[in-house]
Regions:
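Non-catalytic, topology-defining segments of multipass membrane proteins
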Residues: 1-128, 132-161, 207-221
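Functionally important transmembrane alpha-helices
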Residues: 164-216
Length: 221
């Protein structure tokens, strides 16, 4: 039990580390290179106002990444066998196949779970906090209710890794990819963030990450 918890939190700590490295990178670009980065923002803000957004969202994000893994870890160790991730040898062909499969399953699950939290009752109770973000900024990626964090983020984005990926290397590559993609979609840059920013202004479109489910089911906008 305790060994499994250690294995899970070993992965989760990598997830958190990757998230904050990404956010710090965007923070440096947004603040230290403001004159350049603001030219490419969908909604350019004064530098001080942008800094205030980071300060507003960060405490909630830190609380989420500390508290949410507690119930998630207990659930995960009863459902997932992590031992094979530490014993299976890495092969590049297996890695590519597993990453493609993980990306596909994750997109399907994320779309479904995201649409569920847009059911009016659940939206008002859990998901509305995230949609209070009207000016996109990288740290707001995890500016969510704690149960929203568990249900519509952790489960669809993390669980497929443990069922599909066969090595720790593949799993960690996936974490880098999905977190970078998610943060870029919230970072507020033209072209890179426009699709998800449209979702924050019109909650009936663009539920997915890479949008193939939206195109398939008629919610692409």
């Amino acid at each position: 039990m305790f060994e499994k918890l250690y294995q899970f939190y070993d992965f989760y700590s990598y997830f958190v580390f990757t998230y904050f490295i990404n956010v710090f990178f965007h923070y440096v670009i947004d603040i230290s290179y403001y004159d350049i980065s603001s030219k490419y923002k969908i909604i350019p803000l004064p530098k001080l106002e942008l800094l205030n957004l980071y300060q507003k969202y960060l405490p909630v994000v830190v609380k989420n990444v500390i508290i949410s893994p507690i119930p998630f870890g207990v659930i995960a160790v009863h459902l997932v066998n992590l031992d094979s991730l530490y014993t299976t040898r890495f092969h590049i062909t297996d890695c590519i196949f597993e990453l493609v499969l993980t990306a596909t399953i994750t997109e399907i699950l994320f779309y479904i779970f995201h649409r569920i939290v847009h059911i009016p009752f659940l939206y008002k109770r859990f998901h509305k906090l995230h949609h209070s973000v009207t000016t996109p900024v990288s740290v707001a990626t995890l500016y969510v209710d704690q149960w929203d964090m568990l249900f519509s983020n952790s489960i669809p984005l993390v669980f497929p890794v443990f069922f599909i990926c066969s090595t720790t290397i593949t799993a960690k590559i996936w974490f880098i990819f999905i977190l970078t993609e998610s943060i870029l979609s919230h970072a507020g840059y033209k072209y890179l963030s426009e699709a998800h920013n449209k979702h924050h202004t019109d909650i009936n479109i663009n539920y997915g990450n890479n949008l193939f489910m939206d195109k398939l089911l008629g919610t692409y906008g």
